[in-house]
Amino acid sequence: MEKELIFGHRNPDTDAIGTAIAYSYFQNQHGYNTEAVALGEANDETSFALKKFGFEAPRVVKTVANEVKAIMLVDHNEPQQSVEDRDQVKVTHVIDHHRISNFATIDPLFYRAEPVGCTSTVLWEMFKEQNMEIPANIAGIMLSAIISDTLLLKSPTTTDIDKEAVEELAKIAGVDYKEYGLELLKAGTNIAAKSVEELIDLDAKSFELGSKTARIAQVNVVDVPEALERKDAFLAAMEKDAKANGYDLFMLVITNVLDSDSEVLFIGDDESKSVFAKAFGKELVDSEAHLLGVVSRKKQIVPPLTRAFEA
């Protein structure tokens, strides 16, 4: 069987990398020939999880058509979030937990998406449906993905299925998920050593919102005031990046993983700022707004913005 590559979105997080690794194991057990790769370097949080459970970071690829004819996607489906030459290969499988947008294929494919907190939760269900045993290290990296995406089950994206998956995977992996979860999340909140340019690209995704092209970046912290000491530098970097890449608006969501609130920095024209205010019922003051209880880009930021821009 010809080799296929499995990968998550650009600027990969723990779900994108962890689920790619776990899904590659799953598919190889079913006779496929796959390799988990990544569309970017593993961040600090993901590196912590990989080391904890004995994995090397997947190799990073920029293109895939030079290697394979077919690919499998996890944790994304939108082309602007995927590998740049995706249109030159066949997508055979997708496992996701996001909206479906700008996605089309010539041939039928396996596609499974569910409104749960993490793609690894969907994969956990697939393991159970197949009565497949999950190795301890695979359980650990899947557990890490769910903890990361749901902010230790505190995100509004969290479902009962996510909670059940976390409890079972933690037992298999042999860890206390609450204790390990805090260690994992804190590993990803050390932003002091990174430049503003790195931070606005670390976990950033592009979206089509009505007629606007938006870039929405997110960083997790435990000290928001410390992060905002670099506010002017953040805004300048966002402005520069937006102009260079043709984004109509750029949002940086600074999320406090302990309090489950976010501070937003915003670059955009007056129309976009007005739509932001309409979407969240909150005016931007000096390009900044506090969003109480908002932690999820997927569920709490992109949907209201999409509705507001398309109204």
UniProtKB/Swiss-Prot annotation:
Q: Name one GO cellular component term.
A: cytoplasm
Q: Which residues form the signal peptide?
A: none
Q: What class of enzyme is it?
A: hydrolase
Can you provide one Gene Ontology molecular function annotated for this UniProt record? inorganic diphosphate phosphatase activity
Location of the protein in the cell: Cytoplasm
Q: Which residues bind Mn(2+) 1?
A: H9, D13, D75
Where on this chain does Mn(2+) 2 bind?
D15, D75, H97, D149
Query: What NCBIfam families has UniProt attached to this entry?
Result: PRK05427.1
Q: What is this protein called?
A: Probable manganese-dependent inorganic pyrophosphatase
Q: Which organism is it from?
A: Lactobacillus delbrueckii subsp. bulgaricus (strain ATCC BAA-365 / Lb-18)
Tell me the organism's taxonomic lineage: Bacteria, Bacillati, Bacillota, Bacilli, Lactobacillales
Gene of this entry: ppaC
